[in-house]
């Protein structure tokens, strides 16, 4: 998956889809009470990016629905995965619970819109394991509003770069044992040399352990340099989040990589482990 980073308005969304990105990451902000409000990152953000793009959450989800519904004039076949990077810092546990509930409601009302034909997969990406109540109420609300079948299109991710053994315990407590993405990364402003790839290697090794069910996919963020992308591919990641989707795809298509990997299509389930 070539995951375009910080896609927070329609102009940049079109630009990345034109580059060939098959996934996007968007930042979702919340009120103090936990109401999802709009896409927005703000400063600081990645180097060489404009941090202030924004659109209202309802309008954003409706536009994504148009782009991912076959037969819609706006349909874009290559948009497969939407990572919702949830800006939850500072929210109380009550607000986290409200946030999970309300995001489920908004997906039902503005993305699936009753007919459930919009086909993108969503990754509910929570910053910290201490904010896991968001996931709990999100899942519960989908069932309560009779959208439980859409759980087949929902995955989960914690982005705190923490000890995954502890993360697994949180998933166990939530009753989540499938549709799990794991990630490791650092802002593009800091060279990968300072972050290293030890944890990324650990995640891919854990994913590939026979019978292990708490990691389906591993992705790296935010990789913009060829050396970093090549290293990620050598480690066997399933996705690279980037500010330059066309560049990542170009690297992927080089003969030394294309013999093993290709860009995912809708026939590839993002919640099934890939075996080369």
Curated annotation (Swiss-Prot):
Cofactor(s), by name: Mg(2+)
InterPro entries: PLC-like_Pdiesterase_TIM-brl (IPR017946)
Keywords per UniProt: Cytolysis, Dermonecrotic toxin, Disulfide bond, Hemolysis, Lipid degradation, Lipid metabolism, Lyase, Magnesium, Metal-binding, Secreted, Toxin
Gene Ontology CC terms, in alphabetical order: extracellular region
Source domain of life: Eukaryota
Catalytically driven reaction(s): an N-(acyl)-sphingosylphosphocholine = an N-(acyl)-sphingosyl-1,3-cyclic phosphate + choline; an N-(acyl)-sphingosylphosphoethanolamine = an N-(acyl)-sphingosyl-1,3-cyclic phosphate + ethanolamine; a 1-acyl-sn-glycero-3-phosphocholine = a 1-acyl-sn-glycero-2,3-cyclic phosphate + choline; a 1-acyl-sn-glycero-3-phosphoethanolamine = a 1-acyl-sn-glycero-2,3-cyclic phosphate + ethanolamine
Record flagged with keyword Flavoprotein: no
Main function: Dermonecrotic toxins cleave the phosphodiester linkage between the phosphate and headgroup of certain phospholipids (sphingolipid and lysolipid substrates), forming an alcohol (often choline) and a cyclic phosphate. This toxin acts on sphingomyelin (SM). It may also act on ceramide phosphoethanolamine (CPE), lysophosphatidylcholine (LPC) and lysophosphatidylethanolamine (LPE), but not on lysophosphatidylserine (LPS), and lysophosphatidylglycerol (LPG). It acts by transphosphatidylation, releasing exclusively cyclic phosphate products as second products.
Family: Belongs to the arthropod phospholipase D family. Class II subfamily.
Name of this protein: Dermonecrotic toxin LspiSicTox-betaIE4ii
Organism: Loxosceles spinulosa
